[in-house]
Amino acid sequence: MAMFDEDVGCDATPQLLSRRGALLAGLAMAVVVQPAMSRPHKGLRVLFICQSGTAKSAIAREVFRRRARQRGMAVTVFSRGIVLADHVSPPLRRKLAADGIDPAADPATVLERRDWQQADIVVAFNPLPGEVRPLHLRDWSSLGSLNDDYARARPDLDRRIEALLDEIASDDRRASP
């Protein structure tokens, strides 16, 4: 009685797997288990808010979306502005294009009550209006201007996004049985 189908080429007995069979079984487990472990909080909603809705929040949305996708994380990410205005300068637009980031990928939208009420995590780049009181707020108002100093602000934004993704993934691992 063989443990594996002979068509696969593994002739291990029930008592002992060959090294090749054990290696193949281990690789198969890694391929099957790893993607499931890297998909935290299916349906988690992350909201980025900045004053204009077109610069920091929109850029963070696109960077977060890309990084979450690379990690295989199923999260919804969106951005809003307190008062809409186009604050992406032509030099910043060129730098973003060179990095493959399109802050206009989603239309700029003004912040509404339902946005922050439906979000699981809210990241604010500016002080929020008094009536906006999200439960899980991250204050990123200390991030420098992407228009004025992209070379310094972008790596800072990247670090913050990676830390938030790590936190979400860590929370998911703790919540999984």
Predicted feature descriptions by range:
Residues 127-177:
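Phosphate-binding/catalytic loops
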Residues 120:
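Conserved acidic residues
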Residues 39-112:
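Conserved active-site segments centered on acidic
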Residues 1-17, 31:
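N-terminal secretory signal peptides
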Residues 116-117:
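A short, aliphatic-rich alpha-helical micro-motif
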Residues 33-35:
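N-terminal signal peptide c-region/cleavage motif recognized by signal peptidases
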Residues 16-24:
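N-terminal export leaders
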